[in-house]
UniProtKB/Swiss-Prot annotation:
The gene is sephs3. GO terms for cellular component: cytoplasm. The active site is at U50. This is Selenide, water dikinase 3. GO terms for biological process: selenocysteine biosynthetic process. It comes from Danio rerio (Zebrafish). Binds 1 Mg(2+) ion per monomer. Its EC number is 2.7.9.3. In the embryo, expressed in retina, olfactory vesicles, tectum, pronephros ducts and myotomes at 24 hours post-fertilization and in retina, tectum, liver and intestinal bulb 3 days after fertilization. The keyword Amino-acid biosynthesis does not apply.
Length: 447
């Protein structure tokens, strides 16, 4: 499937981005492989990335039928809510231990032997970037992120789920699918695991995803239910990935480009797209490790339901009567302006914009949050391009974005949040103040 113009911005990390990509990476140039110059991976589906999620309220109703029958008051571990994934739908054994069930990021199933637990998750979605290799890496990072959200840094095994579009011709299929699979495999290896099997089918749309499994001891993971009043909320990747990938496609759609061209240049769209692609392909493994070091109380990853959707779900799981209040929104530079210019099409400033392979939202003790952010910035573990000779740049940035206060297990964004314009790599961080200069209280300053 092709268009009249070539896809933009996937030129091997053009514009100074090459150093941030894995060593040896070359973005796909369709013409070099005998494909039409307008070949687009995203043309093989009508939806993008984690934007394919079933709405939360609908999912809640669907999941009710999967709950096992238990006598009232029986302790089944954490209550279920509407989370990122449906995880594993199998019956839970009678073994004792902490248990997470349907609706959470991952399922935790106590095993019958040795006080161990099986932690397992699954995820899949549709292409949202044009480069097959990077799409594979993003898909793998997104699957592993559910484990990382529980502070788990190791994965014993992965399976790959792949559907081949029946609209692809043989040449397209033989070129694109091996690149997607290699990207998935390389990201798995970066995460210290391997892909040992999976399932491949024919489908109208391309789908890629997988299953991640690990057997853990109780101290290997952090249950997502321990937030206390006085904690702060930390986010480990900027928001705006859905806006960036859509804006990139709008470069070739005049009626849509005309709506945003007054607030962003073509070059800035290309940079935002590269930024989003690199962020999505970066593992959340560093954050998972630091969750233990800095005594995290709860966490989730930000994907298809947007930051407010996942914050609300996490709040519902807490043992204590708490509420999450978000004051700051770190957003890829210019994406807030695009969202406004597009008539609030994405709901970015309201926190409902879908993210794909987003960061972790972590509840941390106030006195430890700044050091967590500092160590995120200084660490290069899991950073794309970290293994290159002469690699540049620091680790991942993280932001203190809100507070945990006493409440009724809910989450909200204040009326006029501070928008943190996160610059493209190599630039200087800038902060755009809202009209309410007191939107973020002194104790919630950036780390």
């Amino acid at each position: 499937m092709s268009g009249s113009e070539p896809p933009s911005g996937d030129s091997g990390g053009a514009g100074g981005y090459a150093v941030f990509y894995p060593a040896g990476y070359q973005a796909l140039n369709p013409e070099e492989h005998g494909l039409d110059r307008g070949f687009r991976l995203t043309a093989f589906s009508d939806m993008k990335g984690u934007g394919c999620k079933v709405p939360q309220e609908t999912l809640l109703k669907l999941l009710q039928g999967l709950e096992p029958d238990r006598p009232p008051g029986e302790d089944g571990g954490l209550g279920t809510g509407v989370g990122d994934e449906t995880a594993d739908f199998g019956l839970v054994s009678a073994a004792q231990g902490p248990r997470l069930g349907i609706g959470m990021d991952s399922c935790v199933i106590p095993l019958r032997h040795g006080g161990l637990s099986l932690v397992q998750t699954t995820d899949f979605f549709y292409p949202l970037v044009e480069d097959p290799y990077m799409m594979g890496r993003i898909a793998c990072a997104n699957v592993l992120s559910d484990l990382y959200a529980m502070g788990i840094t190791e994965c014993d095994n992965m399976l790959m789920l792949l559907s081949v579009s029946q609209k692809m011709n043989e040449k397209e299929r033989d070129l694109v699918l091996p690149l997607m699979m290699k990207g998935f495999r390389d990201a798995a290896e970066e995460g210290g695991t391997s892909v040992t099997g999976g399932q491949t089918v024919i489908n109208p749309w391309i789908i890629i995803g997988g299953v991640a499994s690990v057997v853990c001891q109780p101290n290997d993971f952090i249950l997502p239910d321990g937030a206390v009043p006085g904690d702060v909320l930390v986010l480990t990747k900027p928001l705006g990935t859905q806006v960036a990938v859509n804006a990139h496609q709008w470069l070739d759609i005049p009626e849509k480009w005309n709506k945003i061209k007054l607030v962003i240049s073509r070059e800035e769209v290309e940079q935002a797209y590269q930024e989003a692609m690199l962020n999505m392909a970066t593992l959340n493994r560093t954050a998972a490790a630091l969750m233990h070091k800095f005594n995290a109380h709860a966490a989730t990853d930000i994907t298809g339901f947007g930051i407010i959707g996942h914050a609300r779900n996490l709040a519902k799981q807490q043992k204590n009567d708490v509420a999450f209040v978000i004051h700051n929104l770190p957003i890829i530079s210019k994406m807030a302006a695009i969202s406004k210019a597009g008539g609030n099409l994405f709901g970015l400033l309201q926190g409902t914009s879908s993210e794909t392979s987003g960061g972790l939202l972590i509840c941390l003790p106030r006195e430890q949050a700044a050091r967590f952010c500092a160590e995120m910035k200084s660490s290069r573990m899991g950073l794309l391009g970290a293994g290159q000779d002469g690699g540049v740049g620091d680790g991942q940035q993280a932001w203190i974005i809100g507070i945990v206060e006493k409440g009724n297990r809910c989450a909200r964004i204040i009326d006029k949040p501070r928008i943190i314009e996160v610059p493209y790599r190599g630039s200087v961080v800038s902060v755009q103040e809202g009209s309410n200069n007191n939107a973020s209280p002194p104790e919630v300053q950036l780390a």
